[in-house]
Regions:
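Short beta-strand element of the alpha/beta-hydrolase
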Residues: 60, 71-83, 113
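Positively charged n-region of N-terminal signal peptides that target proteins for export
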Residues: 1-5
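Hydrophobic alpha-helical membrane-insertion segments, chiefly the h-region
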Residues: 17-18, 82
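Residue-level signal for beta-strand positions within conserved beta-sheet cores that form or flank
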Residues: 16, 55-57, 109
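A domain-start/cap signature at the N-terminus of enzymes
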Residues: 20-73
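Short, flexible loop/turn elements at secondary-structure junctions
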Residues: 50-52, 65, 83, 117-120
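Cap/lid segment of the alpha/beta-hydrolase catalytic domain
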Residues: 84-126
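Bacterial N-terminal signal peptides
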Residues: 7-15
Length: 126
């Protein structure tokens, strides 16, 4: 009886996993290719004091095309994985190109994107 319950749970988990995978939309070809003639956001490097590790850290801040300091924007934080730093997304992805393309296509609300160095070691390489 115990084996039947385990088999049933595994079968159900497999079925739900297959169903979930089939509903994930695919990205359009060229979504991460720089397009000529579209407005581009700006990327700045900022330095901030980290109270957590007691040292200065860097972060990249992307502001959308047409950014105005007088307007309020939502903020998206893109965090790197273990061993990464604030450049991780730019080294292994193209967030600024993807965001610019989505803005140009009218598919995204303008937002500020922050890519911090979230390493928790005071004297690391970053």
């Amino acid at each position: 009886m115990k084996n039947i319950a385990i088999i049933l749970v595994c079968a159900l988990a497999y079925c739900f996993g297959v169903q979930a995978q089939s509903t994930i939309p695919h990205s359009q070809a060229g979504f991460d290719v720089e397009k000529a003639g579209i407005a581009q956001g700006k990327i700045e490097t900022v330095t901030y004091n980290s109270k957590t590790v007691g040292t200065k850290r860097k972060a990249l801040v992307y502001t959308p095309p047409g950014f105005s300091k007088s307007k309020k924007y939502p903020v998206l934080y893109l965090l790197h994985g273990i061993g990464g730093d604030e450049l991780e997304w730019f080294n292994n992805g193209k967030p600024q190109i993807i965001l610019d393309n989505l803005y140009a296509e009218g598919k995204l609300t303008p937002m500020i994107v922050v890519l911090p160095n979230g390493r928790a070691i005071k004297d690391d390489r970053a």
